[in-house]
Design a protein with these regions (language model features):
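Alpha-helical transmembrane segments and their helix-helix packing motifs
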Residues: 2-148
Length: 148
């Protein structure tokens, strides 16, 4: 890339090197399967809890009306805002979400810093952990009155 092109896209090399470093860290973590599964399950738990908050806010506003107008659109915005916080909490808790790992693994495969086997192991462990966290919250909610 020429010096002139680098000025046009200053973050390109920085972003790619950051993603490749993240891939190396994630690959090392996947070697510690139990710990990696815990981080992935935590992301699933956070996602599920904030989805319940999103659903609750949306349904709460859908039941309200002011001047004959339903507040459902405001509820959808409030619910989406609450759900957006899930991604922030996942980031700050250093949990592992499958969607971010797909981006990291794709960049790693493109630049040939990882192989298909390592990539599939990483994605498989992350998916399993995310589903375990989601499943745990689902089982807990089935036995509660929160969704009534």
């Amino acid at each position: 890339m020429s010096a002139e092109s680098s000025k046009l896209f200053p973050g390109r090399h920085t972003f790619i090197s950051f993603v490749l470093d993240a891939l190396e860290t994630k690959s090392e973590m996947s070697g510690m399967a139990v710990r990696y599964l815990q981080r992935a399950a935590m992301a699933g738990i956070i996602l599920a809890l904030f989805y319940v908050a999103h659903y609750g806010l949306s349904s709460l506003f859908a039941e309200m009306a002011v001047g004959g107008q339903s507040l459902a659109p405001i509820g959808r915005i409030a619910g989406a805002t609450a759900f957006g916080f899930a991604l922030v909490f996942i980031y700050f808790s250093r949990s592992e979400l499958l969607t971010s790992n797909m981006m990291v693994v794709s960049v790693g495969l493109y630049y040939r810093t990882t192989g298909i086997g390592r990539a599939l192991k990483l994605l498989g462990l992350c998916a399993l952990g995310n589903l375990a966290g989601l499943g745990l919250v689902a089982v807990l909610l089935m036995g509660s009155s929160v969704l009534d």
